[in-house]
């Protein structure tokens, strides 16, 4: 199975994996609206890959089989100031 990866034009570090290039039929309309204009990053055969950058390859494969797409969002940012205050015993 081929996999096309698109970068969001609205959300930083957000990627959409779909089964076919330029085929977003399985992606819900509200998600596409939030995602913005998709910008193609790459197309590759997912069956031949053992790993992906930040995404778990098994989760990507499972989501694409079940839903027809996979949405990769960035991990939440760590609030270093809040962690520092907490380490000093300062509560907001």
From Swiss-Prot:
PROSITE patterns: YCGL (PS51648). InterPro entries: YcgL-like_sf, YcgL_dom. Residues 1-85 form the YcgL domain. PANTHER family: PROTEIN YCGL. This is YcgL domain-containing protein Sbal_1869.
